[in-house]
């Protein structure tokens, strides 16, 4: 799969006349990803996306197609039922006085990695009073969040992950953070059942869940603050995007198994207003760790767009199940800095893509990550 569009995908294979209607399979899992319908010699082939075909067939069988001359809305929430509920219990700011937040020295005193700094929109960083001083960093267990005042969601979330001490904990309900005004947090407006959006974690729920049983539980539960999310379609969560941290842990120094991860949305003038909220079209992620082979600090950057899932009149298709259909790409950290207005300190200089000037701009197509093995960790 070389490209994904709203109703079709492009694929690279050999076809002959009469192949139209043939199923395009993902060879990694045997699942159907589309129906081939045309091609251009030595250029590309086209297929109707499998989810589009399924939706049309479902509508025909149910009779809905006769009653829907216009666009339809269909998506699948990332979380349903209890997991989408808000915890109405009022917590107090003092409950967070023991949260250490993101630790710059987590990877070692020789490899200090500071929390990224919002530079271009510094005047839009939300500040708040806590412990007798003005702060801009919401500290949680093993991670921190920096909020945008105008967008009411985070500029970034930075997390320390210790793979050796990871523990699983039960999921809890979503909740607000009492340290900042409720008016600066998006509780429900754009979130809910389809066609609304899912709450997409910036710091993954599992990532700060490490340490003693009590500490791991607190880290897990802290990720369920609405300050740590942004609006995402379920189709956005492609397997490769979700697996980036785990793959980096496999390449981190074996005796430590530690990485630091930063995630956030790009805020642009193109972001559509839906349900009274400006919806980010693209997200970025930066991962830093000590490479097991070199013993040196390494950092890699990634992007993933959900724009293909946001169609006019909320014409949104269902989730793909094939990892071949992810649109995550590895990009230079300097490119992320330029587009986000966030400075990552020394990380841009230890990026294996540093010096790739072509990659800093948006000119030309980028190769999607179809397999984790495509990721470059060293120059």
Placement of each model-derived feature along the sequence:
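Catalytic nucleophile loop of clan PA
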Residues: 2, 14-35
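Structural detector of coil-to-beta-strand junctions
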Residues: 8, 23, 34, 45-47
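C-terminal cap/linker of serine protease catalytic domains
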Residues: 37-86
């Amino acid at each position: 799969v070389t490209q994904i569009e709203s109703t079709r995908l492009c694929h690279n294979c050999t076809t002959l006349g009469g192949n139209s209607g043939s199923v395009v399979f993902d060879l990694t899992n045997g699942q159907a990803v589309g129906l081939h319908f045309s091609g251009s010699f030595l250029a590309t082939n086209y297929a109707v996306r499998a989810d589009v075909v399924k939706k049309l067939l479902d509508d025909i069988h149910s009779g809905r197609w006769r009653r829907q001359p216009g666009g339809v809305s269909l998506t699948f929430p990332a979380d349903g039922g209890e997991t989408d509920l808000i915890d109405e219990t009022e917590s107090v700011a003092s409950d967070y006085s023991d949260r250490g937040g993101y630790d710059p020295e987590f990877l070692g005193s020789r490899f200090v990695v500071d929390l990224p700094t919002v530079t271009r929109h510094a005047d839009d960083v939300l500040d708040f009073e806590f412990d007798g001083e003005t702060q801009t960093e919401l500290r949680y267990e093993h991670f921190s969040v920096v909020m945008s005042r105008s967008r009411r969601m985070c500029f970034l979330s930075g997390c320390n992950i210790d793979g050796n001490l990871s523990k699983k904990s039960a999921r809890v309900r979503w909740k607000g953070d009492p340290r900042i005004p409720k008016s600066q947090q998006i509780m429900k407006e754009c979130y809910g059942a389809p066609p609304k959006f899912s709450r997409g974690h910036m710091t993954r729920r599992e990532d700060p869940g490490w340490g003693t049983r009590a500490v791991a539980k607190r880290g897990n539960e802290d990720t369920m603050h609405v300050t740590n999310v942004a609006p995402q379609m379920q189709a956005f969560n492609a397997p490769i995007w979700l697996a980036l941290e785990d793959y980096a842990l496999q390449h981190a120094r074996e005796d430590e198994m530690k990485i630091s991860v930063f995630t956030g949305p790009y805020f642009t003038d193109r972001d559509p207003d839906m349900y009274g909220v400006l919806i980010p079209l693209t997200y970025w992620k930066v991962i830093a760790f000590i490479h097991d082979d070199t013993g040196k600090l390494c950092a890699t950057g990634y992007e993933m767009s959900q724009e293909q899932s946001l169609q006019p009149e909320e014409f949104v298709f269902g989730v793909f199940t094939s990892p071949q259909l992810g649109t995550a790409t590895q990009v230079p950290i300097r490119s992320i800095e330029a587009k986000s207005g966030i400075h990552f300190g020394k990380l841009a200089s230890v990026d294996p893509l540093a010096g790739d000037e072509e990659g800093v701009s948006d000119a030309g197509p980028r190769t999607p990550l179809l397999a984790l093995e495509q990721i470059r960790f060293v120059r």
